[in-house]
Amino acid sequence: GWFFTLHAIHTMIEGTVAYKNVISNGLVLDKNGNKMSKRLGNAVDPFGALDTYGADAVRWYMLTNSSPWENLKFDPEGVDEVRRKFFGTLYNTYGFFALYANVDGWTGSEPEQASHAAYSEIDRWILSKLNSLIKEVTEAYEAYEPTKAGRAISDFVQDDLSNWYVRLNRKRFWGGEMNADKQAAY
């Protein structure tokens, strides 16, 4: 298989192992769990999926839909849902932040960052959630569980960051002057 071929080629060229660990996905099946086949007409053109949904959405769908070692039921509607729900939410959240950061001239390198004392309860909550996410994702990757890591990131972006933090803090960004509270929100 290609694992051995790539490993052997790299070892011959470089004199070292190409990789120490490999995570491989199972078969990619159609949305009903059947083997894809041109003859049956249920095969998905990978280049068409990439053109329609984008590489990031296809990769994120494949990562978060099932563990890599399990067979994956590929559903184009699922890829579109990932594109809308995860990437759309991430894009809109970043767009909201960038709009107000640019209006306020905030770059993140301001010498007078808000002190932790200025952080509101919700600021401390989102920072706690972020630090917990970092720990959870790191542990998942170290345990070779990328699906668990991806799902945790999706949940954080869609629920904690967008649905709670941004929605409850919009007025802090709308304020006219840069005060400690607004600085803490950034």
Residue ranges, per PLM feature:
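Long, charged, mostly alpha-helical binding arms that flank functional sites
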Residues: 16-186
